[in-house]
Amino acid sequence: MGKVTQEQQVIEVLREKGGYATLRSLNQLVNVSNWTTKTPDASIRRIVQNSKYIFKIRPGLWALEEYRDYVLAKFDLMPGDRKSEERFTHGYYQGLLVEIGKYQHHLTYIPPQDKNRLFIDRPLSEITDSTELPPFTHEDLLRKARTVDVVWLNERSMPLGFYEVEHTTDIKNSLTKFYELQDFNAGFYIVADVSRKKEFEDKLHVSMFAPIEKRVVFLDYDRVVHTYEGLKLVDGSIW
C-alpha cells in the first residue's frame, strides 16, 4: 500500500464529515503533522481548489463529487433554481456573520422569520444567540432594527453592527433601514457579491443618504469568507 497523499487525507476528512465541510473545518481537522510545508492551510486550500474529486458549493464550502447529489439534496439546493440558490446563499452568509460575531464575543441576532433558514446544515436559530432584540430604543426604531439580517450587540445589549445580505434584493431598501438607524453608534454593512459594488456606490451616493455615506461599508462575499476562515488570527477590529 502506497503512502497516503495530502489530497487523500483531505478527501477522507470530507467523507468523515458526511461529504462536505468548510475550509475552516478542514484546516482544523486534517492531520498535517507529517506535512513538510510551513503553510498547511494554504496547501489544503490548493487541494480543494484543484482536486477533480472536490467541488465548491459556495466560497469556503466544499464537497466531494461522489456526494454531489446527496449534499445538494440535503441543503435543498437546486443549481439553476433562483429561489433555492437565494435561500441557501442568504442563510450561508448570515451564518458566517453570526459565527464571526460570536467569535468576537458579541451577542448575535437574526430575525425570527429567518430562524429556520439553514446555515449549511443547521437552522440559524441553533447558532445565533437570539431571535429577539432587547428593547434598546423606542418601538418604531426597534421595528426597523428587527428586520436587519444580522445584528451584533455589545455586553450592554446595545447594537454594534447592522448587516444586510444583498444577494439579489434592492440595496436601497437596506440603505433606507440604515438611514433610520443612524443615531446608534454602530457600523452599517452591506454584504454582497463584488459585482454589486458599483450598484451599491451609485445608490449610496445620493443626497438622501449623505448623513450615513461615510458609515456604510461594502463587504464582498469573499472578504466575509476569508475573515471566517482566519478567525484564529483575528485580533481587534476585523473589517
Where are these regions (language model features)?
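Charged, structured surface patches that assemble and position nucleic-acid processing machinery
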Residues: 208-239
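A short acidic, leucine-rich amphipathic alpha-helix
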Residues: 25-30
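Catalytic cores of nucleic-acid endonucleases
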Residues: 128, 134-148, 154-220
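Positively charged, polyanion-binding regions of nucleic-acid-associated proteins
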Residues: 1-24
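Active-site metal-binding core of divalent-cation-utilizing nuclease and nuclease-like domains
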Residues: 80-86, 102, 109-157, 229-239
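Nuclease catalytic cores
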Residues: 44, 73-112
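Charged low-complexity interaction tracts in eukaryotic proteins
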Residues: 2-7, 33-79
